[in-house]
C-alpha cells in the first residue's frame, strides 16, 4: 500500500501569491445546527437581555445610563452566532420573583436563618430593603461572638426587640452614633465590653423591660442611664461592680415596676449599698436576691425590707452570716413567701429551722451548708411538705434557665441565630 504524500504548504515569506476563498451555503445552516442540538439566535427586544451581575448595584437608579448594544457590520450571510436558545417562558410556566409583592417576599424571608437572610440582602436593592425590614429582626441571638460594637449598634438599629448576646466580646470603643433602639429584652451577661462601649449602647435604650448585665463592670453614668427605663420588670446585676450607692438609689427609685431584682454578689457593695437597696427597692417586687453580703446585711436591713416589700414570693439571703434564727419572725410577716434561701448563714442553728415549717405558704427551703448531711434527712422527714435543698442556683431575674441548649431569653425564643442554623 502506497502512502500519499502531503501537499507542501506554501511559505508565507515567499513571493508566491496564494489566495483562499471560504464559502458556505446558507441553506445548510439549519441542518448543521439541528445536528448539533442548537438553533440560531433569535432577535430579542432590547429590554429582554439578562441583567449582568455588575449592574445589580444600579437597580433602582433611574439616572443610570442604559447599556449600548453593539451593531454588527456586514450581512447575516458572512457569519452566524450560535448559542443556546433562550428558554421560552410559555414552556416553563411560573411567576417571576420580580412580580411577587413585598408581603409575599417578606413571608419567604421570614423562613430564612440569619446567614441566608444576609445572603439574599445582597441580591438587589429591593431585596436589601426587604431583608432589612424590622419584622424580620424581632429576635436575635449572637451568643459568644466576637463583635465590633458598631456592628452591634447597626443590628440593634434594625428594630431588634429581644437581643441575646451573653459571653460575647466587644472590647473596642463605639465609634458610630445611633438613633434610639427599640430593644426591650437584652442579655449581655458575662461579656467582655468596655465601660464606655456599654454606656454607648445602653444610652440608646429607653424601652427595656428585661435586662441582664451579670458579671459586668458598670459605672455611675451607666446606672443613671438605666434609670431612664422606667418599665423595667426584671433586672439582673449579679456580680456587677463600679457604681456607687447614690447611682443605685437613683436606679431603684426610678424603676417602680420591678418584679424581679438580682443584686447578689456585687463585688464592691458596702453596708451603705445594702441599706439603699432595702430602703428604695420597688414595693411591687416579688422576687429578690440579696445573697453574698456576709457582714454587710444586718437584721435591721431585713426588717426594713419586709416592711417595704410585703409581696415577696421568692427571697434569697444566702451567705449573710449576720442573720440568726431570731430573724425568723420577719419571714412570718411575708404572707406570700413560697421560696426562701438561707444557705451558708452559719449562725443559724439547724434545729431552729423547724420553725420555718410553720410558715403556711412556704414551699421550698434552701439551707446548704447549715444542716450536716447526717441530719438533713431528719429535717426532710420532719418537714415533709417542704422541698429542702432542691436547687443549687437561683433563677431570680436570670434570662436563661436550664441547660446550655436552651436558647430562650425570658421565655422568648430567638429566631435569628448563628448557633448551628437549620436553614430551609
From Swiss-Prot:
By its UniProt entry, which Gene3D superfamilies does this protein fall under? Ribonuclease Inhibitor (3.80.10.10)
Q: In which pathway does it act?
A: Protein modification; protein ubiquitination
Task: Name all F-box domain ranges.
Answer: 94-140
Q: Which residues carry this modification: Phosphoserine?
A: 64, 72, 75, 179
Question: Which GO cellular component term is one of those annotated?
Answer: cytosol
- LRR repeats mapped onto the chain: 151-176, 177-204, 210-234, 235-257, 258-284, 286-308, 309-330, 334-356, 359-378, 380-401
Name the domain of life.
Eukaryota
Q: Where's the motif Nuclear localization signal?
A: 67-73
Region spans: Mediates interaction with hepatitis C virus non-structural protein NS5A: 1-220
Region of interest (Disordered), residue spans: 39-73
- What name does this protein carry? S-phase kinase-associated protein 2
- Organism in which the protein naturally occurs: Homo sapiens (Human)
Q: Which InterPro entries match?
A: F-box-like_dom_sf, F-box_dom, Leu-rich_rpt_Cys-con_subtyp, LRR_dom_sf
N6-acetyllysine modifications at: 68, 71
GO: which molecular function terms? identical protein binding; ubiquitin-like ligase-substrate adaptor activity
Subunit structure, briefly?
Answer: Part of a SCF(SKP2) complex consisting of CUL1, RBX1, SKP1 and SKP2. Component of a SCF(SKP2)-like complex containing CUL1, SKP1, TRIM21 and SKP2. Interacts directly with CUL1 and SKP1. Interacts with CKS1. Interacts with ASB2 which is the substrate-recognition component of a probable ECS E3 ubiquitin-protein ligase complex; ASB2 is likely to bridge the formation of dimeric E3-ubiquitin-protein ligase complexes composed of an ECS complex and an SCF(SKP2) complex. Interacts with the cyclin-A-CDK2 complex. (Microbial infection) Interacts with hepatitis C virus/HCV non-structural protein NS5A; promotes the ubiquitin-mediated proteasomal degradation of NS5A.
